[in-house]
């Protein structure tokens, strides 16, 4: 084979990889990196700046959820969802985590009553969808001992699972995971997400040497599974209401909900686990266990 043949072969191979990744991959990558940089900056800046970012994101998520479920007739229900998310976030930021959690069921009941029977269950779920991860993330970051590292761990695992799942699915995906809900999800993508997250989780031992590398790896894999479940749940929600995306705010990704679905699920799971394992130190519960 001459040089020209090699060149043609290489170009064809490159074109094949590009086609599998999709024409929107560069835009998705750029948007993802930009969002990651913003999240990391606010996380490192301190507990209060991080809380501000989380609350702002929760307000947008509440808006997108309301528009998805109720359309242009969202009105007062969305106002309740947004107000509850803001109140819960503020209470958590000033250390009143118990009151923040109490605000969620109250807001959910109010949203249900105001929905007047129209998608009332989804009105209630919207309050928890935006509010619970908001409280959990702010609570996690406020942990004086390991809060910063715990939040970084969560974000890194979610990003790893999302990226590895996307790449493995696009490049090697053959077996559909749940085609009726998410046609592009594959078992190969799920396996790639779990393996990559387990590896990254185990490597986090170099950052937190007092933790168990095996436990961190297992935690990474479990959180990756939760993130993928969150992604599927949001896909099911969009399919239920006949929407492709929840918004157009982020190029290549859709709305904020489309980008943080995995983080919402993981943060909620971490918060609930912390209440059970070590309510006094959510970061310790995540990274070290009991």
What is each stretch, according to the model?
Residues 170-171, 238-241, 264, 268-269:
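Re-entrant/interfacial helical elements at transmembrane boundaries that shape
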Residues 274-290:
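Juxtamembrane boundary at the C-terminal end of a transmembrane helix
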Residues 233-249:
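Interfacial helix-loop-helix junctions of multi-pass membrane proteins
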Residues 185-191, 248-264:
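Divalent-cation-assisted or electrostatically stabilized phosphate/pyrophosphate-binding catalytic cores
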Residues 29, 65, 163, 229-235, ...:
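Generic detector of well-ordered alpha-helical packing
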Residues 259-275:
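Final/C-terminal transmembrane alpha-helix of multipass membrane proteins
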Residues 201, 205, 270-274, 278:
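Juxtamembrane/transmembrane-helix interface segments of polytopic membrane transporters
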Residues 2-221, 225:
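Membrane-embedded alpha-helical bundles of polytopic integral membrane proteins
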